[in-house]
Amino acid sequence: MKIISKKDDLMKEFKYIELIEQIKKEFKIDYYGDHGISHWQRVYENTQKLSNYYKIESEVFELFALLHDSKRHDEYEDRYHGVRAAGYIQKLLRNGDMVLNKEDTERLLYACANHTKSDKEDPLFNDIVVQICFDSDRLDIGRVGYDVDPSYLATKYAKSLVSE
């Protein structure tokens, strides 16, 4: 199945089509804006690039791409949107709308709740799946007019992409 962005005709295959429809119904900001479907597609593509480099597969990557900004109330000023996204994920899991093992649940909750800040002392910060999620979002910061700052990236490969 494919999701097509009407705004710029981007096409991307996502596994969680029903989830996308649910997110879209509840999305409080512009679905085609800076934190909408086109951004989610780029974040997912970034997760694939990084995870292929590190030879890691995880269900968390697509879910992070779709959910990390899903509970924004404002396009730019919304410091608690990641925490709200984590709460939404817990609801989806309780309702059986998605199923993850314990380790991936912890990774996804942590990555969404903390994607705008980083506690490098937290053990989950050092998890490569979480780091790929963080870097995949941060590599797309150019969409809102900022340059990617390598000091905010967690993986060596993401840092090397910025210096290319």
Identify the function of each model-found stretch:
Residues K2-K15, K25-I56, L67, N95-M98, ...:
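Divalent metal-dependent phosphate-bond-processing catalytic cores, especially two-metal-ion Mg2+/Mn2+ enzymes
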Residues I20-Q22:
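Short, glycine-biased loop/turn motifs at secondary-structure junctions and
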Residues Y32, G36, D74-H81, N101:
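Short secondary-structure transition/capping motifs
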Residues I37, Q41, E62, K102-A113:
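Short, well-structured alpha-helical segments
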Residues V43-Y44, Y80-G96:
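An active-site-proximal "capping" alpha-helix that borders the catalytic cofactor pocket
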Residues S58-Y76, H81-A85, L109-T116:
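His-Asp-centered metal-binding catalytic motifs of divalent-metal-dependent phosphohydrolases/nucleases
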Residues Y76, I89-Q90, A158:
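Juxtamembrane helix-loop transition sites at the ends of transmembrane segments
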Residues R79, V83, K102, E106, ...:
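Short, amphipathic alpha-helical segments
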